[in-house]
């Protein structure tokens, strides 16, 4: 089934890929992305681990409706999460290149 040293090579490749994935996950956790809403009036910056790092609210919104401001904050956060997930997918593509993964399979992180 496995050629001479085939199983050993397979295990070695799996370990190398696991090491690369762990390193990439650590790098991704340090990256920051900013989501926006209200044409940039609300900005939320999160890191790759989806921890909120900064919230910026244009002063003109402080006089507006509280409900609208809450909606803009939620939309900016959701935009930041979407951007972080896209960035993670791009970064992990280099690690998983050549692997036959089923469609929609999400790598663990």
UniProtKB/Swiss-Prot annotation:
Name the lineage.
Bacteria, Pseudomonadati, Pseudomonadota, Gammaproteobacteria, Pasteurellales
* Cross-referenced InterPro entries: YbaB-like_sf (IPR036894), YbaB/EbfC (IPR004401)
**Entry annotated with the keyword Iron-sulfur:** no
Q: Which family does it belong to?
A: Belongs to the YbaB/EbfC family.
Q: Which GO terms describe its cellular component?
A: bacterial nucleoid; cytosol
Q: In which domain of life is the source organism classified? A: Bacteria
Q: How does it assemble?
A: Homodimer.
Write down the PANTHER family for this protein, in alphabetical order.
Answer: NUCLEOID-ASSOCIATED PROTEIN YBAB
Question: Which keywords does UniProt give here?
Answer: Cytoplasm, DNA-binding
**Which Pfam families does this UniProt record tie to the protein?**
YbaB_DNA_bd
> Which species does the entry assign this protein to?
Pasteurella multocida (strain Pm70)
Q: What's the name of the protein?
A: Nucleoid-associated protein PM0205
Has the keyword Cell wall biogenesis/degradation been applied to this entry? Answer: no
HAMAP family (alphabetical): DNA_YbaB_EbfC
Instruction: Write out the annotated subcellular location.
Output: Cytoplasm, Nucleoid
Just give the chief location class: cytoplasm
